[in-house]
A protein has these predicted regions:
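Conserved phosphate-binding elements of NTP-dependent enzyme cores
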Residues: 1-945
Length: 945
């Protein structure tokens, strides 16, 4: 019987019901580039990650022994009837970025491992003190080297027994004389050992014993070899050869510097690992930085006096009031050193500031204390604010207190290694005149050029050829996915989701696997339109190797390049989970049911505003120089919506998140943050609040949900507490909280589920038997509002709740904003852990529902992440609403539909990394479109037509 080949050509999914999928059946072509698209919340990720990937992983796990499975953590079987033709699956999503401070681009791509091997095998060690090259040679190599001197050269072999040490060294000289040696060289002068030698014991001396004198000629090899061995024994592996013409040749049996008496260990790959004690800087343990208390965070406003509360660090706030021990110490210091606690801190002389910050240097002061803890006189040697707080930080066992103290710390480069992470001996090893830190801190673009032009000796090339081939290939893959501006030393914790995903994509291309299903989640995030083609060609390369690519994506270019598009919908949440259309971009355009097709064909489009609003003022950032910013001045308009654009790595986040947001947060919100490098920001007085609407989760536990985050749950609980039934039972609003005892089910502590550990099977979460997953006890659930219990309300979607509460204006207003930002499908009580993609829009809705001051600045970083064309359409309307009434909206964005609707654009560039950091163009979208040097202008021009 012939095999059914159609099964092999497709991943055949039947009856998928994961999350909101409605018994979905679809045949996804194998070995092709397939894009899954649809509205946000339509079920794309449920199909790609929770069904296809989950089942692929589960089947692989099933093939392992139960012993191995207990360490790996099992995956639950997805709710699907069958999946046939499923290849092994690899997921490249955005959530699994490694936030470990020891993880870098180099370590996650394993390029750094190859560099460690290269440096260990062909690196040239140098003395970490004087910088001279250190060579390690065997006796035979030394003999060959000396025999290569011109014939008849007179040489003497010297044993350097003392290098730069004080003393008379009489014993050593006597010992040399007894051993039969005749001459000795001291501080460059030759002496006979038979004469009286008297050395000044207070001066550092160099002493070399003359072991042999020879003339270079054939036949002396045996004698030369014996003499060298004698020298090496006397001088602990060192040999000096004086050629009588004043030239000294140094030889070493180990890696040691004859001048500085510095020895270095055998060079191995681990010598270059900052995660290994053999290579890491001993001071910062390979982190490259230290967390240190910062006096600018401890005393942020130096125009205040101590009595007015200048010292804000934990443990010292009480020094403003009489009766605290901290106040008694400061009173004692003021008496001893004659200063007043009522003087503004900035007016103290440097000596007084130093005493307060760094202490009395062991000098005790008399502290008179009278307070709640009794009274007495104490002798206290004040260690200074910094050391005192350091001690408290070390001694506290409370995580909360540790976090509190850490808010007064800042990251400073390690003083020992200058932020280079390795010990000095490892940093003194070079390849092509660069140490490993210098090489890994080059941008990928520069590194690629450096590797191409690398000058190595014949022997180095012979040894390092294969290693260099691997390095060059992997560096090229990083370049191909548009990451030229990154360096291998960049910490992975500082990467955006899109960057981290593209790095993992480059690693997978490098692995060269075949027959795998790669499942990706919006790889184009954070990528400028200019770099999209490179990303697409990388994806094609992965497909052409013989792999299946399933990409969840909203980017138009990616859809048009795909072999097949699967459109899930038609709506979001309850209204999604079905197959709407499938085929090429052209097929979708012809399909009347596909909203995606309508946007691709241009039937639906986001309109360009008829007119651009004029700014009401400007914020002027002076001398911005954080990261790659080139000391630039930037004017940010107020009262309108501004888009900050530019290629990846151009400096957008440095300007907006590091400088503008942190400076405004410090000045307006009194946040304990240190802004990026800049001179000043003018015009801050025109604002009263800054809000950063980022993509971080709205909560880290399942107890946090949209209702609690937006604050609407408080009003819903008030409503339930106001019912006649609740009043009759004496229930207050706290009764309707699942976080406190009283109304919640105590069997599951209000979680609704109970976790059962299963060892080598996955942990099982079962609904609580007592409350049946409803989180509240029976009495609380008996209280109804319009025939619905508090559980029923939490289980409503935003759309259902909007109708249910239409006669309660305060509640309706908050729920309406969730609906307006496109979140009609989420449930009010849905755990925040299930809402990672929706977090930013929930925050947007929360801000929209607040009363506007007209002097607020909102900062958003790529709000279109995870949004379909139709969702972007809604977002544009929301951003316009936010900036009404005098508020300012600043958006970092690559999406051209958002950029074209902005009132103003500031384009940073022209390139990423070192070639970026300047303002390329600014003005309305129409003005920027005319700029001959702006990449953004070139692309936005097409969207304005």
């Amino acid at each position: 019987m012939a095999a059914d080949t159609t099964k092999k050509q497709f991943i055949r999914i039947r009856g998928a019901n994961v999350n909101n999928l409605k018994n979905l059946s679809v045949d996804i072509p194998r070995d092709q580039f397939v894009v899954l698209t649809g509205l946000s919340g339509s079920g794309k990720s449920s199909l790609a990650f929770d069904t296809i990937y989950a089942e692929g992983q589960r089947r692989y796990m099933e093939s392992l022994s139960s012993y191995a499975r207990q360490f790996l953590g099992q995956m639950e079987k997805p709710d699907v009837e069958s999946i046939e033709g499923l290849p092994p699956a690899i997921s490249i999503d955005q959530k699994s970025t490694n936030r470990n401070p020891r993880s870098t681009v180099g370590t996650v791509t394993e390029i750094y491992d190859y560099f460690r091997l290269l440096y260990a095998r062909v690196g040239i060690p140098h003395c970490p003190k004087c910088g001279r090259e250190i060579k390690k040679q065997t006796v035979d190599q030394m003999v060959d080297s000396i025999m290569s001197f011109p014939e008849r050269t007179k040489i003497q072999l010297l044993a350097p027994v003392v290098r730069g040490r004080k003393g008379t060294h009489a014993k050593l000289l006597e010992q040399a004389k007894r051993s039969g040696y005749v001459r000795v060289q001291i501080d460059g002068n030759m002496y006979e050992l038979s004469e009286e030698i008297s050395l000044d014991k207070n001066i550092k001396h160099n002493i070399e014993i003359v072991v042999d004198r020879l003339i270079v000629k054939p036949g002396i090899e045996k004698r030369l070899s014996d003499s060298i061995e004698t020298v090496l024994e006397l001088a602990e592996g060192l040999l000096m050869v004086d050629t009588m013409d004043g030239n000294i040749h140094n030889f070493s049996q180990s890696f040691s510097c004859p001048d500085c008496e510095v020895s270095i260990d055998e060079i191995e790959p681990r010598s270059f690992s900052f995660n290994n004690p053999f290579g890491a800087c001993p001071d910062c343990l390979g982190l490259g930085y230290k967390m240190e208390f910062d006096i600018d965070l401890m005393i942020p406003d130096k125009s205040l006096s101590i009595l007015e509360g200048a010292i804000v660090v934990t443990g010292w706030q009480s020094c403003t009031s009489e009766g605290s021990f901290s106040r008694a110490i400061l009173d004692a210091l003021a008496r001893e050193y004659d200063f007043s606690l009522a003087t503004p801190f900035e007016n103290y002389p440097e000596k007084i500031k130093d005493i307060l910050i760094n202490g009395t240097n062991g000098h005790s002061v008399k502290v008179y204390y009278k307070g709640q803890r009794g009274e007495g006189v104490y002798d206290v040697a004040f260690p200074g604010l910094i050391r005192n707080v350091e001690q408290r930080y070390r001694e506290t066992g409370s995580d909360t207190m540790k976090q509190e103290y850490e808010s007064f710390m800042r990251i400073t480069p390690c003083k020992t290694c200058k932020g280079q992470r390795l010990k000095k001996e490892s940093l003194a090893v070079t390849v092509a005149d660069k140490n490993i830190y210098e090489i890994t801190n080059l941008s990928i673009e520069k590194l690629k050029a450096f590797l191409a032009d690398m000058q190595l000796s014949e022997q180095q090339l012979l040894i390092g050829k294969q290693i260099l081939k691997e390095i060059r290939a992997r560096v090229s893959f990083l370049s191909d996915v548009g990451l030229d501006y990154l360096s291998l030393g960049r910490a992975t914790g500082t990467l955006s989701g899109g960057e981290a995903q593209r790095i993992r994509l480059a690693t997978q291309i490098g692995s060269g696997l075949v027959g795998v299903a790669y499942i990706l989640d919006e790889p184009s995030i954070g990528l400028h339109q200019r770099d999209n083609d490179r990303l697409l060609s990388s994806l094609m390369k992965l497909r052409d190797l013989g792999n299946s690519l399933i990409v969840v994506e909203h980017d138009e270019d990616t859809m048009r390049a795909a072999d097949c598009i699967v459109d899930i919908g038609p709506g979001a949440g309850e209204h999604g989970g079905q197959l709407v259309a499938m085929g090429t971009a052209e097929d979708l355009m012809k399909n009347e049911n596909s909203i995606t097709g309508a946007y691709l064909s241009g039937k639906l489009k986001i309109p360009v505003p008829a007119e651009r609003r004029k700014p009401t003022g400007f914020l002027t950032i002076k001398g911005a120089a954080e990261n790659n910013l080139k000391n630039i001045d930037v004017k940010v308009p107020l009262g309108i919506m501004t888009c900050i654009t530019g290629v990846s790595g151009s400096g957008k986040s440095s300007l907006i998140n590091e400088i503008l947001y942190k400076r405004l947060a410090r000045d307006l919100n009194r946040a304990r943050v240190i802004p990026g490098k800049h001179k000043d920001i003018l015009g801050v007085d025109q604002l009263d609040k800054v809000i950063n609407i980022d993509q971080s989760p709205i909560g880290r536990t399942p107890r946090s949900n949209p209702a609690t985050y937006t604050g609407v749950f408080d009003q819903i609980r008030d409503l339930f507490a106001a019912t006649a039934d609740a009043k009759a039972r004496g229930y207050k609003k706290g009764r309707f909280s699942f976080n406190v005892k009283g109304g919640r089910c105590e069997a599951c502590s209000g979680d609704g589920i109970i976790k059962i550990e299963m060892h080598f099977l996955p942990d099982v979460y079962v609904p609580c038997e007592v409350c049946k997953g409803k989180r509240y006890n029976r009495e609380t659930l008996e209280v109804k509002y319009k025939d619905k219990s508090i559980y029923d309300v939490l289980n409503m979607t935003v759309e259902e709740a909007l109708t249910f509460f239409e006669n309660v204006p305060s509640i309706k207003r908050k729920i309406q904003t969730l609906y307006d930002v496109g979140l009609s499908y989420i449930r009010l009580g849905q755990p925040s852990t299930e809402l990672s993609g929706e977090a930013q829009r929930i925050k947007l809705a929360t801000e929209l529902s607040k009363r506007s001051t007209g002097k607020t600045i909102y900062i958003l970083d790529e709000p279109t992440t995870g949004l379909h064309f139709a969702d972007v359409h809604k977002l544009v309307e929301i951003l316009k609403r936010l900036s009404e009434g005098g508020n300012t909206v600043v958006v970092i964005e690559h999406n051209l539909d958002v950029i074209k609707t902005a009132d103003y654009i500031i384009d940073i560039g022209p390139e990423g990394g070192d070639k970026g950091g300047t303002v390329v163009a600014c003005g309305t979208p129409e003005e920027v479109a005319q700029s001959p040097v702006s990449y953004t202008g070139k692309y936005v021009k097409k969207y304005l037509e």
